[in-house]
A protein has these predicted regions:
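Transmembrane-embedded, aromatic-rich helix segments that form part
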Residues: 43-55, 88-91, 165-169
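Short hydrophobic alpha-helices at membrane interfaces in multi-pass membrane enzymes
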Residues: 17-35, 64-77, 136-147
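Transmembrane signal-anchor helices characteristic of membrane glycosylation enzymes that use polyprenol
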Residues: 35, 41, 82-83, 200-219
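Membrane-interface transmembrane helices that cradle and orient dolichyl/undecaprenyl
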Residues: 7-26, 53-64, 125-135
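Alpha-helical transmembrane segments of multi-pass membrane proteins
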Residues: 1-9, 27-30, 43-49, 172
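Cytosolic-side transmembrane helix boundary signature
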Residues: 120-139, 160-199
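Lumenal/periplasmic acceptor-binding loop at the mouth of the active site in multi-pass
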Residues: 217-407
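Membrane-interfacial interhelical loops
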Residues: 1, 84-113, 142-166, 215-233, ...
Length: 407
């Protein structure tokens, strides 16, 4: 809350001093706070939408609805660049360097990481210098591309697809920057490029606060979840892999069966490999070189029964009971399922039942109830699980409350 409040206060300070020299410093400070807040709570990134809108309305002579929508779209791209680019990208690219120097060249642990940090700092410093004082266009463009690549911004995705996507993005940016056929008025000014690089620098500095996690873990404290002592364990920690995965827009439900494939008279579950988990290999002799080994593959199982916007997905029996309770009895629909030559029937919830759970529990109980506690009123302070007499929200207006929770 503090980071969010201070961040929005700073954009108002920028608006107040918009026409003053060096007003850009407020934007750079905002970028630093956003980088710091990534280590506190990712919700602070939502301030970016409001920040971009304030910037648009202040700098635009005639704001329009379409202009506002474009500003919101730009803010979404900025959030994606930070959340899916810089945050996992720095760790991802650092991991590539670490594997190259340790497994590929035989250096000791952390050598690749140190080389990467030196290169990243040098690239950012070079790009800031070139965009501020440089006169050679090719040097400005190369420093920008190098900084973007080393921060991992374009490498969104897993395995080879993420690398290919990143190379394509870098190629498109390079073609745009180096193109002589694009008029200068459609190219970013040095001031804008310098501001962007300063913001990238301060976001990276703020984000570096996560180094405390590694330092703390190296001391082996009693509470050391996932023990993020190296770049690979830190990546899994930042990705919150300890909390598992869940389908958001499309995926399995609680009764879904894993899809099977018959090979050589046996059935095997189908899955996608999202990546590999690396760990430090224990030495068997003093002369053995440091190296990393693949501990496990990060698998994502493929399910035979899927639906759009699945809300009831947990196979835990306790959760199944709650699903049934909040829906008011799940009848579902029967779906045929070919289990390696044997036809079976799986009962999955209907989309109507799925939406009932969404609106009654996720929206009504877990969001709207808390919202109205703060802005309307609270029935009592008893812990409730959906009962009519425990912990609901009220308005304080008698006839409305009778309709909500009875007399």
């Amino acid at each position: 809350s503090l980071c969010t409040a201070v961040t929005f206060w700073l954009i108002l300070k920028w608006e107040e001093n918009y026409d003053q020299p060096h007003s850009t410093r407020w934007l750079v400070l905002i970028a630093y706070l956003i980088g710091v807040s990534v280590g506190v709570h990712l919700l602070n990134l939502l301030c970016i939408v409001a920040i971009v809108l304030v910037y648009y309305f202040k700098t635009s002579e005639k704001p329009t609805v379409w202009g506002s929508l474009i500003a919101v779209g730009i803010s979404a791209l900025i959030i994606a660049a930070i959340l899916y680019g810089i945050v996992p990208g720095i760790v991802k690219v650092g991991g590539w360097f670490e594997l190259l120097f340790v497994n590929g060249m035989g250096f000791s642990f952390n050598t690749g990481l140190i080389v990467y940090i030196v290169l990243l700092v040098s690239a950012i410093a070079w790009s800031v210098y070139e965009t501020q004082n440089g006169t050679r266009e090719w040097a400005i463009n190369i420093s920008l591309l190098l900084t973007i690549a080393l921060t991992g911004m374009p490498f969104i995705g897993h395995k080879a697809s993420g690398v290919i996507f990143g190379i394509i993005v870098l190629a498109l940016i390079g073609a745009y920057l180096f193109s002589s056929s694009i008029p200068e008025k459609f190219k970013p000014s040095k001031w804008l490029l310098n501001t962007i690089m300063l913001c990238v620098m301060t976001i990276t500095i703020g984000y570096s606060s996560y180094a405390v996690i590694v330092i703390r873990s190296t001391a082996n404290p009693p509470m050391d979840q996932d023990s993020p002592e190296d770049i690979f364990a830190l990546g899994e920690y930042l990705a919150r892999e300890q909390y598992g995965d869940r389908p958001l827009l499309y995926g399995q439900v609680y009764s879904s069966e894993v899809a099977l494939e018959e090979r050589e008279d046996a059935c095997y579950p189908l899955y996608n490999v999202k990546g590999k988990s690396y760990g430090r290999k224990e030495k068997t002799s003093a002369n053995e070189k440091d190296s990393y080994y693949v501990m496990d593959e990060k698998r994502s199982y493929i399910y035979a029964q899927n639906m759009f916007f699945p809300r009831m997905y947990s196979p835990d029996n306790r959760h199944k009971s709650e699903y049934n309770h909040w829906v008011g009895g799940i009848k579902g629909r029967k779906v045929p399922y070919n289990s390696c030559g044997q036809m079976k029937t799986v009962t999955v919830p209907t989309q109507l039942e799925n939406l009932k759970f969404f609106f009654r529990y996720q929206v009504g109980f877990m969001y709207w109830r808390y919202f109205m506690w703060n802005f309307a009123g609270r029935q009592n302070d008893l812990q409730g699980h959906g009962e009519i007499e425990r912990g609901n929200w009220i308005t304080g207006i008698n006839f409305i409350d009778k309709m909500l929770i009875g007399g």
